[in-house]
Structures are given as C-alpha cells and as structure tokens.
Amino acid sequence: MPPRCRRLPLLFILLLAVRPLSAAAASSIAAAPASSYRRISWASNLTLLGSASLLPGAAGVALTTPSRDGVGAGRALFSEPVRLLLPQDAAASASASRAATPASFSTRFTFRITPSPTYGDGLAFLLTSSRTFLGASNGFLGLFPSSSASDEGELRDVSTVAVEIDTHLDVALHDPDGNHVALDAGSIFSVASAQPGVDLKAGVPITAWVEYRAPRRRLNVWLSYSPSRRPEKPALSADVDLSGLLRTYMYAGFSASNGNGAALHVVERWTFRTFGFPNSSYAPPPTKYIGPMPPNNQPLPPPPSPSPSPPPPSPPPPPHPNHRRRHLFYKVLGGVLGGMVLLGLVVVGSAVLLGRSVRRKNQEHAVASEDMGEATLSMEVARAATKGFDSGNVIGVGGSGATVYEGVLPSGSRVAVKRFQAIGSCTKAFDSELKAMLNCPHHPNLVPLAGWCRSKDELVLVYEFMPNGNLDSALHTLGGATLPWEARFRAVYGVASALAYLHDECENRIIHRDVKSSNVMLDAEFNARLGDFGLARTVSHGGLPLTTQPAGTLGYLAPEYVHTGVATERSDVYSFGVLALEVATGRRPAERGISVVNWVWTLWGRRRLVDAADRRLQGRFVADEMRRVLLVGLCCVHPDCRKRPGMRRVVSMLDGTAPLILVPDKMPPVLLQPVPNASSMNSADTANTAFFSCR
C-alpha cells in the first residue's frame, strides 16, 4: 500500500456558506449518514468579539464597521475548538520519531473589503488558542496586542497563526506595501509576504484558498475574483513549520481592524477542514468525504485501502440479446406507466390536502375568534369612521402588514383603525394581537383597545388615537423639535412598566417580540404607550419557552433569539435595552454601520459613559438619570441572556429603588451555542467527518 494511503484522509470539515450547494454536493450529502453532518448558519456557533456583527439575514459576518468610531477591531470565531495537534502520548505510539504530530488543514473563504471612504488595515484568517482575546487595531488586524505591558501579559499564553489580507502600508510593521498577503506565525511581523494578484480594496467579492501540508511544512495561499476557479500558481508559498505554534485544540475564524481608516470587512462564505493525522486510536476512524470537492477539482487525500475481502462469485452468463431488448422494453413501459399513475395520485392527493388545509385554517380562525367573544362594534361603524377606508386617512402600516387609518367614531372620539386582510399570516397576526390585548386590558402604558370587528374578508382592531405619533418619529425626524429629556426618561420608564406588566401581571405571560421605538406611541401628554402586538405570543406562567421562526426588527433582536428562535421574556429585555440606549443617545440601533450597543459599551469602558448622551439635548438632562438609563440599557443587552435582569428589576433600577447591576468594562463575547439535539456533533476525540452548511 503506498505511503499516501496510510494517512487518514479527513478528520474535520467546517462549511459556512450563504449560497446553495451544487447538485453534486447535495447528492453526496444525501448519501451520507444523517449523523455525519449538520447545517448551521452564520447566526449559530459563533463567538463575536469587538465590532464584529452579523449581516442582516445572517448572510455573513461584518468584522468591522465603516467608521472610525467604536472598537476598531473585530473577530468572529467558530465556537467549537478544532483538533490540530495529536497529543504527545498518542503521537508517540503512532510515530516514535516525533513527540507530537500536527494536522494539515485547508480553508476557502470569500471576503469583501469596502472602503468608507478610506480603507482600514485589512482582515485575516486565523487559528488561535484563545476564544476571548481580541488584539489591537492600528495595523495589528485584531490579531496581536500593541506593545503595552498589560497587553503582552494578556497574550503570554495565546498562540496565533494567521494569514493576512493586508490593505495598509505600515513601515513600522515591515509591510512591503498596502496591498499584500502575508503569513504571521506567532507575531505581527510576517515570516513571508507576497503580491496577491488582485486588488484587495476593490470592494468586490474575492475568494482565498489557504492550505497547509504538515508533512511538507509548506503553506500556500491563492486568491481570485472567481469563487470556483483557484489559480494554478499560489500567490504566496511559504516553507514554515507550524508544529511549535499549533495547540491540541484551537479556534478557527477571522479578524480585522480599521486603524485610522474606515472600511467594512465582510466574510460571506467559509469552508474549513483538517486532515493528515496518522491512523491511531486517538484519531477518528477513516470516513468518506461528504462535502463538495475542492473548487480546483484537486482530489482529496485518498482514504486508507480497505482490508482484503474474498473475491465475489463468478457472474452468470449474459442473457440472449433478444431477451435483453424485450426486458428493456418492459422496464421502460413499466416506468412510464408507473410514473403516470404516481403523478395522478400526487395531483389528486395535493388537491385533497390543500382543500383540507384551507378548511382547517378557516375553521381554526373561526374558533379562535369566537373564543375571544363577540365583536364589540360593527364593520359598518369602522368603515364610516375611516370614510370607507379612504387612502387619505392612512397613517401607517403595522409590522404584520396591516394598514392603519385615522378615524372618528360616532361619539366623536378619534381612533386608529388597524385593518387586516383575512388571509394567511394577517389572520394569525390579528388573532395574536387581539388575544394579547384581551389578556392585558388595563395598563396606562399600553395603547388602549377601543373595539374590534370581523367580516368574511376583513379583520379590524380599533385603538385610541395617539396624537403625537410614535417615539421613532419624535427621536429621529430631521428638522423637528428635539424631544426633551423629561419626556425621554418618562418614555423609557413607561415601556419598562408595560413590559413588566405583560411578563408578570397578566393572566398569561405575553412576549411582545417586537419592542422598538416605532411601536411606542405617544399620547397627548407624551406618555409612552407600547403597541403593535401582531407578533406577540401568549404563554401560561411556568410554561415552556416558545420556539418560533425569529421575527421582529434587526438591531433589536437578542442574539440567542436569532440563533434558536426561542422567544422568552429575556429576548424582550434585550430589545428594551436597545430601545433605552436609542432614546438616551438619539442613535438608531445601527447607524452608519455602527452598533449603538458596541458604541455605548466602548464609552463605558473608557469611563466616558455620559458622553453618549444625545448632543441635540445640549446638556439639558439630569446626569444621574442619563447615567442610570445608559447602564440599565447595557445590562439589558448583556450577550448572556441569563445575566439580564427581569423587567421588574429594570423598573426598580430606573426609579432608584434598587441598585444598578454591575456592568463589565468590556462587552462580553457573544457565544452562540447550538440547540442541543440528537444530531449534535460528537466530541473531537470520537467524531467522524462533520459537515456544516449555511443556506
């Protein structure tokens, strides 16, 4: 057996991709055992540090923001460590000539660097022994610390190997120019660098391939504008022994920094795998490669040869040609007739099931609405109040797609009429909102329900009219009057009181799921009234958390809710925390690419918290109240949902009757762990090939 066949071909495959797999890849996956792979998205199993954040729709990871504000560096790591070194005892049994055996590895990723308007330092693929350390900006790409003694102490036990995609010339760091690729082996001073053959700052997707062959002690890097055609010749080829830097387990991921520039560093697609451990009891058993072949169509290292087996029995003599033709004819005829019969059954069955589904949904809606009691006003009254639902009376659109009209009832009361179509998701939103409002009828900080009605094609909710619009418009309308601090503080306190009521005091717990400034209405006295319960869910006290498709508005959604779809009171608390920071700072959750959470937390770490106050207030606020709102906001957006306070505690902290919760100087990393299930990946010691795919 050739020596190459004695190596284990594949230990670990990690794939993060935002594009559909090819048909060939899909068929190979389908043939693999169900337990040998799982699919994840960018929103799962990642640790985000510094300025790193998920792109809308979890379409990738932004490592930096296109601004000079904030941390300036970001890092995204796969949360589960990867085995890269065989321990000494196992290595000794496999090969007496070496104390430890490193793995070979390869990775492919598609990235995009967009100047805004200037470029930053660049980004890097890295392997690191620390999941929580984030290095410096200003040329260091978030990989290594600056030269301060405190940072050096923090780095003492951290091992890092990185491939730089460098877009900034820093003479002090021995950079050759402002457009190069380089290898860092334990230090920011690169051991090798080269021209990439592409313009790294072009703002277009670029694909990089990195491959390290441990037996040859060589690392190669290719770059191309094409995501599928790897160049024949590598841009960088470095002879380097990484065994002294690799640890038994390390974390794979990306890091970037902006330094004195401002650019958006995005990774859109990522594949990673290790291979090359000698066959031993400590390494996983050989398995088939179940992912797509490498884009350059280079074969993977072959698996070990199978053990000899007895020869198969001699085949029977071939049939006569006429028999073969007749047999083939019957096969084709049977296949055609069988296909036609099957198609007919599918069409008939689909029609029957569709009819049943429609009838069942209509029946379910009728039952749901009937359970809520009789309508409190007629559809004719609702139509008359809005002048026949005249488009000139439209004042907004609800998050569930319902249209909101201003109207006047026969009594002269001004109302907001929310009109749903009696189809699909609109019906569900109507039922959810009506059920929530009937379960929590009385609270001064909820928009009061004045009535409701239904017909065959329309569903209507009627609320008291809020003459001062919503909090979003009051905060962010250009050229308008600045909302004074007294009204802002009262709004934050009012929304906190409303959420505490929904979570703890209603007959059933109500999870709002869409707390944001545009859903906070302002009455005639600028009192805050929380509204729009179209996404709300009702759960009995002590009942299990809700698992749903994540819904709401990006920027306000808790990271664990985006990842798991499990809606709890703590996900509402996170949304409230973002709202509190928005009200105090006058900034939207994400403005010009800057997260208000990251920005305020950075100022808190620099002991400049009150500097986050909205400049339009011109200092006209109570400093203690401003500080209290900002700190309450930060503790509510803690990445670990278990460390967020309940809304009752939030109310007490805001009114000063409870002490503030201690907030760490640095924002803790966002640890997005997978939901445990039977198909979760086994430990690294015993896992077969693992396949990860993001769609």
Curated annotation (Swiss-Prot):
| PROSITE patterns tied to this protein | LECTIN_LEGUME_BETA, PROTEIN_KINASE_DOM, PROTEIN_KINASE_ST
Q: Where's it found, cell-wise?
A: Cell membrane; Cytoplasm, Cytosol
GO MF annotation: an example: kinase activity
Catalytic residues as annotated in Swiss-Prot or TrEMBL:
D514
Q: Give the Extracellular membrane side ranges.
A: 24-331
Region entry Legume-lectin like: which residue ranges? 37-276
Cytoplasmic topological domain residue ranges: 353-695
Q: Which UniProt keywords apply?
A: ATP-binding, Cell membrane, Cytoplasm, Glycoprotein, Kinase, Lectin, Membrane, Nucleotide-binding, Phosphoprotein, Serine/threonine-protein kinase, Signal, Transferase, Transmembrane, Transmembrane helix
Question: At which residues is Phosphoserine found?
Answer: S378
Q: Which InterPro entries match?
A: ConA-like_dom_sf (IPR013320), Kinase-like_dom_sf (IPR011009), L-type_Lectin-RKs (IPR050528), Legume_lectin_dom (IPR001220), Prot_kinase_dom (IPR000719), Ser/Thr_kinase_AS (IPR008271)
Identify the stretch annotated as signal peptide in this record: 1-23
Highest rank taxon of the organism: Eukaryota
Q: How is it modified after translation?
A: Autophosphorylated at Thr-376; Ser-378; Thr-386; Thr-403 and Thr-657.
Query: Which tissues does it occur in?
Result: Expressed in roots, leaves, lemma, palea, pistil and anthers.
Reactions catalysed according to its record: L-seryl-[protein] + ATP = O-phospho-L-seryl-[protein] + ADP + H(+); L-threonyl-[protein] + ATP = O-phospho-L-threonyl-[protein] + ADP + H(+)
Q: Which Pfam families match?
A: Lectin_legB, Pkinase
Region Disordered, residue ranges: 286-323
Q: What is its EC number?
A: 2.7.11.1
Q: Report the glycosylation sites.
A: N45, N279
Q: Name one GO biological process term.
A: pollen aperture formation
Q: TM spans, by residue?
A: 332-352
Function recorded in the entry: Legume-lectin receptor-like kinase required for normal pollen development and male fertility. Regulates pollen exine assembly and aperture development. Plays a critical role in annulus formation, and may participate in the formation of the fibrillar-granular layer underneath the operculum. May function by regulating the expression of genes involved in pollen exine development. Kinase activity is required for its function in pollen development.
| Family membership noted in the UniProt record | In the N-terminal section; belongs to the leguminous lectin family.
The protein's assembly and partners: Interacts with INP1. Interaction with INP1 is required for DAF1 polar localization at the future aperture sites in tetrads.
- Stated name of the protein: L-type lectin-domain containing receptor kinase S.7
- Where does this protein come from, organism-wise? Oryza sativa subsp. japonica
Q: Which gene encodes it?
A: LECRKS7
